[in-house]
């Protein structure tokens, strides 16, 4: 008969951390991911954005009124690396107000499967 997996004897989060999470809705775990890994993820995200042709679509991501603003690009993005702009990224003529690197709200959704840098990071045992 296989033995049961070991149980943690101490909580993963302290009482103060749980309280902060309940109060704020998020928790910052300082030092959980080494700075060098964060730098690599930021650099790769920048490379992906630079390589993205902003003329191919103008999909805006917002959590407000998402049902109305969800488009086919968003709905078809589950198996791709897709880019979504900030609300207000475009002027009345449809031109970006600032460089695309400063206009992206979200990169989604499959970079953890399709990009080797995000894949390596996302599959670390510490994140499970």
Regions found by a protein language model. Give the residues of each.
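Non-heme Fe(II)-dependent double-stranded beta-helix
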Residues: 2-22, 30-128
